[in-house]
A protein has these predicted regions:
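Short membrane-interface helical motifs at transmembrane helix boundaries
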Residues: 62-82
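Membrane-interface junctions at transmembrane-helix termini in multi-pass inner-membrane proteins
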Residues: 97-120
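Alpha-helical transmembrane segments of multi-pass membrane proteins
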Residues: 81-103, 152-153, 237
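Transmembrane-helix boundary and interhelical linker motifs in polytopic inner-membrane proteins
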Residues: 4-5, 22-56, 109-115, 252-255
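Hydrophobic alpha-helical transmembrane segments
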Residues: 119-134, 142-172, 201
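Interfacial transmembrane-helix starts/ends
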Residues: 13, 44-58, 188-192, 238
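Small-residue-rich midsections of specific transmembrane alpha-helices
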Residues: 13-38, 93-100, 207-211, 238-255
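Transmembrane helical elements of multi-pass membrane transporters/channels
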Residues: 154-166, 170, 185-255
Length: 255
């Protein structure tokens, strides 16, 4: 917030619900499914993990195409701010890395190994903070939109770092063969039986969150307010007030 200012954080928070929706869709709750099935230890764990990766990547490619085609419509017609266009395009770069990272985390959660997740998460956050502190001040001098876009793209770099760390923690004796990557019908059936209900449940909240800034901007524009004023006020609520309000949820979630 101190690096990009009120206007920057307001623009970022205007885009964030769209970011969250596509992130939820990109994972399709497959990490949760893999975690549960790995913990049961009844299946070929290698096939569960590595056969799911091509599926989730194909699904992400479809989402990337949707983002590329709809970014202009979302930014101009829904969010009413053309500056959102480039940051929304940047979301497409993050999806495969986020999905891969969470898939590997799901494997370790299923094995009840928390250390890989903890270490990868700490390093991921360090990378994100260092890159943000180093590059955002330079980018904001060029254009605020570039700085906000980088805040989206930095997730791609940090998630890639996390993937490398998680792969280091994978058992060294594992040899991935063609059969491990080839989807098995029973495994896919079991994975989808868990992921589809979970995704449907999460989508209800994500769609509501996605519609929040759209309805707010449309309503306030109809009431005669300027888009700059709306963006700043939404940024104050979503970027300052709500994080403080939801802070206690961190402790209950940890339990």
């Amino acid at each position: 917030t101190r690096l990009i200012g009120l206007e920057g954080i307001s623009l970022y928070m205007l885009i964030f619900p769209t970011f969250s929706l596509f992130m939820s869709l990109s994972q399709f709750s497959l990490p949760t499914s893999v975690s549960k099935l790995v913990s049961e230890d009844k299946y070929n764990n290698k096939n569960l993990v590595f056969s799911s990766i091509p599926i989730i990547l194909i699904f992400d490619l479809i989402l990337i195409a949707i983002i590329l085609l709809s970014a202009s419509f979302i930014s101009i017609n829904l969010l009413k701010d053309s500056r959102c266009y480039l940051p929304i395009l940047c979301i497409s770069c993050v999806l495969p890395f986020e999905a891969m990272s969470n898939m590997l985390r799901g494997y370790f959660f299923g094995k009840q190994k928390m250390l890989p997740h903890v270490i990868s998460h700490i390093i991921e956050q360090i990378v994100r903070l260092v890159l943000t502190i180093m590059l955002v001040p330079t980018l904001i001098k060029i254009d605020l939109v570039y700085a906000v876009s980088f805040l989206i793209l930095v997730n791609m770099i940090s998630e890639f770092t996390s993937i490398i760390i998680l792969l280091i923690f994978m058992p060294k004796h594992i040899k991935i063969t063609h059969q491990d990557i080839k989807p098995q019908r029973n495994n896919i059936k079991n994975i989808l039986s868990i992921s589809i209900p979970n995704t449907n449940t999460r989508l209800i909240g994500n769609i509501g969150y996605f519609l929040e800034p759209i309805l707010l901007t449309s309503g306030m524009l109809a009431a005669g307010y300027d888009i700059s004023y709306i963006t700043l006020e939404y940024g104050i609520v979503a970027g300052y007030s709500m994080p403080l309000l939801l802070l206690p949820g961190f402790f209950t979630g940890a339990i």
